[in-house]
Amino acid sequence: MNLLPCNPHGNGLLYAGFNQDHGCFACGMENGFRVYNTDPLKEKEKQEFLEGGVGHVEMLFRCNYLALVGGGKKPKYPPNKVMIWDDLKKKTVIEIEFSTEVKAVKLRRDRIVVVLDSMIKVFTFTHNPHQLHVFETCYNPKGLCVLCPNSNNSLLAFPGTHTGHVQLVDLASTEKPPVDIPAHEGVLSCIALNLQGTRIATASEKGTLIRIFDTSSGHLIQELRRGSQAANIYCINSNQDASLICVSSDHGTVHIFAAEDPKRNKQSSLASASFLPKYFSSKWSFSKFQVPSGSPCICAFGTEPNAVIAICADGSYYKFLFNPKGECIRDVYAQFLEMTDDKL
């Protein structure tokens, strides 16, 4: 969740994002960065810079390396540089410079993937990074890109050169032709891989439909309806076994869908009437909850299989529990930016 160029809440938060298994989340601040354990909530690291802000933080699971990009009113680093921070040494150990602004960074143990506004560059994760690949994209100001964290799957997904298309590339064998998925007619707003890299979920700027595709064939598996009104989708994430997905939007709602068992999702009683528009046969979320503040948020599943966590731009942390019927209760609320080690 990128809150640049400005966060209306005035709390100094510029960016929030989960690590690869959603066990931690990192925050870029006007004065440094922070790392938290997701569930239970605990501040793990707080690095303050007197001289500047961090607009993007990318973790590599729980290891000591993080990718940082400068941001905010006074960026700590130039926005056209990726800095690899070693948290054991408390300093940057790798620096990669580009001719244009960096939109996002993705990491896996052997690769650094840098997203520019119409191009993606892949480097070795070594002390002197070597450029391996360059992929063209359509104009991509949100820096959409996902890299499968699974050690047996080197899949990289990003917007194709055609509007609404997703390109899937296997970084382990780039001689294979990429899989091109015409996911939506409109501009993409969100893409997400499951942890195994076998499924990709997509949403367009319209934000009413979530589509799930098989990554090896590119075939559509499911179409899920978030709502009837347009919305800006901030986040899509799946649980460990990819049976559920959660989706957050600017309507202040987090929806939970069954990704593998569509019968669990709600459907109109008019769904079987063939003469009615497709809308009536839509599969809706079986559970949803409202973030009380209505603030932009990212979401992920917690340590319990029936828990969903929401991390909000106003500094709020929510943990909701849902049951098989879709009933939802709030279990935990906290202000994560105000936490210190002595409070925990």
Swiss-Prot record:
Principal place of residence: other
Record flagged with keyword Chloroplast: no
InterPro entries: PROPPIN, WD40/YVTN_repeat-like_dom_sf, WD40_repeat_dom_sf, WD40_rpt
Coiled coil: none
UniProt record, GO biological process: autophagosome assembly; cellular response to starvation
Location(s), subcellular: Preautophagosomal structure; Lysosome
One GO CC term, this protein: lysosome
Keywords tagged on the record: Autophagy, Lipid-binding, Lysosome, Repeat, WD repeat
Motif (L/FRRG motif): 224-227
SUPFAM superfamilies registered for this protein in UniProt: WD40 repeat-like
GO MF annotation terms: phosphatidylinositol-3,5-bisphosphate binding; phosphatidylinositol-3-phosphate binding
Domain of life the protein comes from: Eukaryota
WD repeat start and end residues: 183-223, 228-267
Record comment regarding domains: The L/FRRG motif is required for recruitment to PtdIns3P.
Matching PANTHER family: WD-REPEAT PROTEIN INTERACTING WITH PHOSPHOINOSIDES WIPI -RELATED
Membership in a protein family: Belongs to the WD repeat PROPPIN family.
Subunit structure: Interacts with the TSC1-TSC2 complex; stimulated upon starvation. Interacts with RB1CC1.
Biological role stated in the UniProt entry: Component of the autophagy machinery that controls the major intracellular degradation process by which cytoplasmic materials are packaged into autophagosomes and delivered to lysosomes for degradation. Binds phosphatidylinositol 3-phosphate (PtdIns3P), and other phosphoinositides including PtdIns(3,5)P2, forming on membranes of the endoplasmic reticulum upon activation of the upstream ULK1 and PI3 kinases and is recruited at phagophore assembly sites where it regulates the elongation of nascent phagophores downstream of WIPI2.
Protein name per Swiss-Prot or TrEMBL: WD repeat domain phosphoinositide-interacting protein 3
Organism: Pongo abelii
Taxonomy of the source species: Eukaryota, Metazoa, Chordata, Craniata, Vertebrata
